[in-house]
């Protein structure tokens, strides 16, 4: 084992709760991305000798009650997958005293640790690649679900279209 890392015989350090928030469940589902994310979290928790609880929280539930139950169960920290979450839906989590990291979501007005994908840059680079290799204007298929990630990807796409001197209105 490496210096500073607990060995496999070390006692459990605590419990991390991975909360998957689902507003409609259409975005956060059983896809390879979310499966790999869960597996990576599980692997890191085991390596660091933390027990992992996975909990689904739905929009129509009593969020504050569920949070209280999670904390009362002895939670050492929370990883919150907020892909489908709005700033208003995050509000009950802001009062927590246990460490919390927000995954795949960011709220400009709330001071919370986050782990994000750079959606704007990713969409920009992908669009730039398509323009360079296809030498034609790509189209953009947009989801009917409004989440921050999708808005950021659209922003990156349209920035690349404009940077290439193309008409954004033709990219329907």
Language-model-derived ranges and their functions:
Residues 2-67, 74-76, 158:
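Amphipathic helical "hinge" segments at domain boundaries
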Residues 27, 85-87, 109:
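Glycine-rich nucleotide phosphate-binding loop and flanking beta-alpha elements
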Residues 31, 64, 90, 150-154:
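Conserved strand-to-helix beginnings and helix N-cap segments that scaffold or border functional pockets
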Residues 66, 88-97:
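Catalytic-core regions built around general acid/base machinery
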């Amino acid at each position: 084992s490496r210096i500073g890392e607990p060995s496999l015989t070390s006692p459990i350090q605590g419990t991390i709760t991975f909360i998957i928030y689902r507003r409609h469940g259409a975005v956060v589902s059983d896809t390879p991305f979310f499966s790999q994310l869960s597996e990576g979290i599980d692997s890191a928790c085991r390596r660091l000798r933390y027990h992992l609880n996975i909990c689904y929280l739905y929009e129509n539930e009593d969020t504050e009650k569920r949070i209280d139950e999670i904390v009362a169960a002895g939670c050492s920290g929370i990883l919150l997958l907020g892909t489908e979450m709005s700033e208003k839906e995050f509000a009950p989590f802001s009062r927590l005293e246990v460490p919390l990291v927000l995954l795949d979501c960011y709220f400009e007005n709330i001071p919370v640790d986050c782990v994000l994908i750079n959606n704007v840059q990713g969409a920009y680079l992908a669009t730039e690649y398509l323009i360079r290799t296809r030498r034609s204007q790509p189209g953009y298929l947009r989801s009917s679900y409004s989440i921050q990630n999708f808005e950021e990807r659209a922003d990156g796409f349209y920035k690349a279209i404009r940077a290439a001197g193309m008409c954004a209105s033709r990219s329907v």
